[in-house]
């Protein structure tokens, strides 16, 4: 039997839904909703949360002294406290010369062959700085590989980029010819 610290789980979920969904590979809709299975899949990448189930998310909500989350129709959202701007309409933006992406070593071969793909999300998520990219990559691998994306060159050749916030850029699929592996 696995004992779950629901208070710590709530803090993890809050961080994922309110503050840094990009670190968890989550794409919130205009109202902040995300598919529960997507959240669970991301949580399961961390050893501490491998056994968390949808039932545990319901228990977490019930045990809380404040109503922080809502579950409906297979989706979950934080009700308040978001520190990220809601991105309802994504406007294309010219990116900086380079952007970064941290990834697990096990994905490098596929990325070299197919480029960076959204992997079930609407966009590829890129970081404006090395530190953020590596932090994101460490969610899946203790020694992530840093990818350097020649974003301005890709933009000039028709790849679309969108500004998510000051640390995150979104893009359509990026062919491997624009990526350096470090």
Curated annotation (Swiss-Prot):
GO molecular function: NAD+ poly-ADP-ribosyltransferase activity; tRNA 2'-phosphotransferase activity
Keyword terms, alphabetized: NAD, Transferase
Protein name: Probable RNA 2'-phosphotransferase
Organism in which the protein naturally occurs: Acetivibrio thermocellus (strain ATCC 27405 / DSM 1237 / JCM 9322 / NBRC 103400 / NCIMB 10682 / NRRL B-4536 / VPI 7372)
Keyword Cell membrane: no
Its job: Removes the 2'-phosphate from RNA via an intermediate in which the phosphate is ADP-ribosylated by NAD followed by a presumed transesterification to release the RNA and generate ADP-ribose 1''-2''-cyclic phosphate (APPR>P). May function as an ADP-ribosylase.
GO biological process: tRNA splicing, via endonucleolytic cleavage and ligation
Family per similarity comment: Belongs to the KptA/TPT1 family.
Pfam families in the cross-refs: PTS_2-RNA
EC number: 2.7.1.-
Primary enzyme class: transferase
Keyword Chloroplast in record: no
Superkingdom of the organism of origin: Bacteria
PANTHER family named among the record's database cross-references: PUTATIVE PHOSPHOTRANSFERASE (PTHR12684), TRNA 2'-PHOSPHOTRANSFERASE 1 (PTHR12684:SF2)
InterPro entries the UniProt entry points to: Ptrans_KptA/Tpt1, RNA_2'-PTrans_C, RNA_2'-PTrans_KptA, RNA_2'-PTrans_N
């Amino acid at each position: 039997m696995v004992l779950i610290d629901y208070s710590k789980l709530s803090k993890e979920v809050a961080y994922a839904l309110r503050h840094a969904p990009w670190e968890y590979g989550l794409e919130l809709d205009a109202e902040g909703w995300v598919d529960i299975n997507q959240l669970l899949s991301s949580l399961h990448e961390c050893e501490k949360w491998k056994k968390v189930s949808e039932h545990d998310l319901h228990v977490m909500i019930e045990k809380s002294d404040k109503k922080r989350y809502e579950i409906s129709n297979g989706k979950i959202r934080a009700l308040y406290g978001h520190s990220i701007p809601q991105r309802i309409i994504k406007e294309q933006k010219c990116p900086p010369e380079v952007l970064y992406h941290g990834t697990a070593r096990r994905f490098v071969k596929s990325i070299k062959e197919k480029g960076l793909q959204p992997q079930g999300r609407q966009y590829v998520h890129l970081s404006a700085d090395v530190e953020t990219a590596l932090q994101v990559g460490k969610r899946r691998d203790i020694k992530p590989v840093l990818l350097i994306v020649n974003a301005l060159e890709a933009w000039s050749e028709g790849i679309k980029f969108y500004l998510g916030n000051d640390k995150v850029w979104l893009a359509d699929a990026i062919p491997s010819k624009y990526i350096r592996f470090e």
